[in-house]
Amino acid sequence: MERARRRGGGGSGGGRGRGGKNVGGPGLSKSRLYPQAQHSHYPHYSASATPNQSGGTSEIQELASKRVDIQKKRFYLDVKQSSRGRFLKIAEVWIGRGRQDNIRKSKLTLSLSVAAELKDCLGDFIEHYAHLGLKGHRQEHGQSKEQVSRRRQKHSAPSPPVSVGSEEHPHSVLKTDYIERDNRKYYLDLKENQRGRFLRIRQTMMRGTGMIGYFGHSLGQDQTIVLPAQGMIEFRDALVQLIEDYGEGDIEERRCGDDDPLELPEGTSFRVDNKRFYFDVGSNKYGIFLKVSEVRPPYRNTITVPFKAWTRFGENFIKYEEEMRKICNSHKEKRMDGRRASGEEQECLD
């Protein structure tokens, strides 16, 4: 009896231990998902010391965080700093519908220079998504949902497998692009399946595996996040704010003894009809550039023109302005001549 009680007590204690570890579903520990909260608003991030292969630690400091909620997902955008410089960590946290569903997390890490390119790419995808929405509304108006579903299933092609746990259904690719920097590639794919449209951002290594890279951790595995298309604008706006607030500081730290930064001209803006155009001069490790933004809420499109291309841009603007002015004047003169001829004919008839 005493042996049975000891055996039963040991089993009960073990059960309590296992139950404490498996909060949220089997194989997922709440303490692993929310290790040591750095602040109450973003409790899912670990401490700033990251282990490396040699057994030491690389101090990583968190500078800023933003959170974007889209449908059943939360996206955390954190600007961090290591001994190599500043970088952006994007974490996607997905919570299932039921209590028994696991909380899944995926992440993406990229330098601030790549984040700036990602911001520009997002502008293109947002514009394309808006165009698809208008086009789809015109095409599907008057058709039943069943007809639309059959048509989409007929024209959709299965996609190659992606990261584990994505649970993606067969889908079609609506737009694709990529960013290549150093030995990494970032693929952006706007896709559609029976759940809706989404943007998948995937990072791959072009050479080498298992390296400790710029971000202070192993880069041997691909990283992927999936962003619902409806939230691309909000996600892009949060990204823009972080880049504007912390991108320039990263640039200054990378200059490493260069001369004092140049005093750049102040930005300007003007309004035309329902749009506003912004002109902002900036600089990074690649040189000086002019950022031209066209804003029509809730949309914002931006192009970046390097300093060496300003002269050619200016020449082309002046050229087309002069040509268009000549065309308009010629058209106006033709209309005036037509009116004069019509008036003379009327006088002859009188």
UniProtKB/Swiss-Prot annotation:
Compartment(s) of residence: Nucleus
Protein name in UniProt: Purine-rich element-binding protein gamma
Gene3D superfamilies: 3.10.450.700, 3.30.2450.30
Biased composition (Basic and acidic residues): 137-149
One Pfam family here: PurA
Any single GO CC term annotated in Swiss-Prot or TrEMBL for this entry: synapse
Tissue specificity comment: Isoform 1 is expressed in testis. Isoform 2 is expressed in blastocyst and kidney.
GO molecular function: purine-rich negative regulatory element binding; RNA polymerase II transcription regulatory region sequence-specific DNA binding
Compositional bias segments (type: Polar residues): 47-59
Signal peptide range: none
Entry-linked PANTHER family: PUR-TRANSCRIPTIONAL ACTIVATOR (PTHR12611), PURINE-RICH ELEMENT-BINDING PROTEIN GAMMA (PTHR12611:SF3)
Alphabetical UniProt keywords: DNA-binding, Nucleus, Phosphoprotein
Residues with Phosphoserine modification: S163, S166, S342
Keyword Nucleus applies: yes
Organism: Mus musculus
Biased composition (Gly residues): 9-27
Chain residues forming the annotated DNA-binding region: 54-296
Region (Disordered): 1-59, 136-172
SMART domains given in the database record: PUR
Taxonomic lineage from the root: Eukaryota, Metazoa, Chordata, Craniata, Vertebrata
